[in-house]
């Protein structure tokens, strides 16, 4: 059914519905899945300059396949407190501030495969509580994709959570076979091609980055692991980061700021991090010094293989 959101026409999907955008079709509007299940959004058509491309809230079993989103003012796809989201063969291009690619808040059982994201903010971001969404973020798989961040992060995990309950977790997350084409961010607090920066009493654990190729960093960091209290976005520090694997990572960038690993205090630390087969400019890394990491306090059990 159709509804008016501001000055924009929006299609609101019902349960057990397929929306098909035929190749050559251009929709100047958005698609919304709110409290529905078993929805498919298919085809090779385009969403052109929506305020937000596709919104999925309080829903389950939503498939997006083949769509192109051009110049979304905000998220290309956002997920909130939803499960069973699958996104395949999606292309996204955006140029304005805050125009993230795929952001998921308190979502579980998410599969992203074969997407191309060229965004002027985070390409992929995973959070727990934000806005009116509550709960953990777990079992997220991102495969065979290309990320190009004009600004901010190609991959961002953490940041937002729930300090009132203090028990939300981001876990069982895999990024595999990913090409990162660009990372350009002036502010060091928001740098990192692969970033885990937990705040708001979040805990991030059991996360793997594997077979990641970074082609260029105009300004930024390769890795950014941090338990933080960002006064702009958080109401408390994160709980910790642990059991993280970086395997088969290569980067050919020559102008890279030092990566960062930093805990918050003795009870909110970073621990058990593995760097395996990391290759920078053709040279396999054998030490933290060669990896160019600024290792600060409250960090334990860092291994290089």
What name fits each language-model region?
Residues 1-6, 11:
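Single conserved hydrophobic/aromatic residue that forms the stacking wall/gate
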Residues 6-8, 16, 22, 28, ...:
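Surface-exposed or flexible loop/turn and strand-edge residues in extracellular/cell-surface modules
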Residues 12-14, 34-35, 57-58:
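Flexible, charged surface loops at secondary-structure boundaries
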Residues 18, 37-47, 60-71, 83-94, ...:
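Right-handed parallel beta-helix
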Residues 21-22, 42, 197:
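Short His-Asn-centered micro-motif
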Residues 48-55, 71-75, 95-103, 119-134, ...:
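Extracellular beta-strand/beta-solenoid scaffold signature
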Residues 184-305:
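Extracellular beta-rich repeat passengers
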